[in-house]
Amino acid sequence: MSRTILQPGQIEAAANIPPHLHQPSRDLFARRGERLLQLAEGHPMGDYLRLVAGLCRLQQALLDNPPALAPLDPERLRKSREHGMPPLAYDLLVREGAWLPWLDALLAGYPAPANAAVGAALEQLREAEEGQRKAWAIALLSGQFDLLPAALVPFLGAALQVAWSHWLLGLEEGAVVETESRTLCPACGSPPMAGMIRQGGKETGLRYLSCSLCACEWHYVRIKCSHCEESKHLAYLSLEHDGQPAEKAVLRAETCPSCQGYLKQFYLEFDRHADALADDLASLALDMRLAEDGYLRRSPNLLLAPGGE
């Protein structure tokens, strides 16, 4: 067995290298729900934000007390690590159906809704056959929102998110490795929902992309499009808020003229409580502004269908 002895300078350099990825905290959904309730106060979409906050509370309850599940295939996990592939590849796991008990548990735990449309959506999911549920899930995770009813999206997306976050938190250290694609989640292969500009210690100023499905965050250099990887002529757009200058805005969208896409970025320096999903839902006015300017949203939010609110 060969051994490498690090010299003092190498040890210091290694200690200053920021981690490639971060797992979500085990109270992710509880904190997200609290953030949504905070943002809902006086917001024109307050009712929807409160509905999603309720879903987040249910997600947290399921994460704390998960349904009975078969363990993930250890041989597949080994091969994924060996070949630099996402161990929780969503396209494969969705088709295998290991996430379906999470959907059943979420539907069983959701309180009787007063809203008739919500009740109808829940009933449609309950009555759907396994094949239909899988088809809807594939459509949602591949961004084909026109292939599933918009009213189903928040509930289907919530079940998928908590299932994948549970699996991610259960992986052994080192199971997730850097993959060839830096623009997709190294854990599950999903696109990012937003970028988080970190604040604190050696990570200050670094950007981590937040996965739309499993909530893994992975390091991605700044001033580089998270869709086409172009670095030229990127611009940053924010909405005026309480008279704050643009350079102190919590939210700024990074726009790319090469692919006409954009990604929202949240600067934790100015609000350490910002949450990728909650703050994204609360800032759809910025999406509308960007759409008017001809930019396309490349980052999905699994709890909202485009045009569905």
From Swiss-Prot:
Q: Which NCBIfam families match?
A: FdhE
* This protein's UniProt keywords: Cytoplasm
Q: Which organism encodes this protein?
A: Pseudomonas aeruginosa (strain ATCC 15692 / DSM 22644 / CIP 104116 / JCM 14847 / LMG 12228 / 1C / PRS 101 / PAO1)
Q: Which GO terms describe its biological process?
A: protein maturation
Its localization reads: Cytoplasm
Annotated Gene Ontology cellular components are: cytosol
Coiled coil where?
Answer: none
Q: What does this protein do?
A: Necessary for formate dehydrogenase activity.
UniProt name for this protein: Protein FdhE homolog
Give the GO molecular function terms.
Answer: ferric iron binding
HAMAP family, per the entry: FdeH (MF_00611)
Q: Name one Pfam family in it.
A: FdhE_C
Family to which the UniProt record says this protein belongs: Belongs to the FdhE family.
The UniProt entry, under InterPro entries, shows: FdhE-like_sf (IPR024064), FdhE_C (IPR056796), FdhE_central (IPR056797), FdhE_N (IPR056774), Formate_DH_accessory (IPR006452)
Which branch of life, at top level?
Bacteria
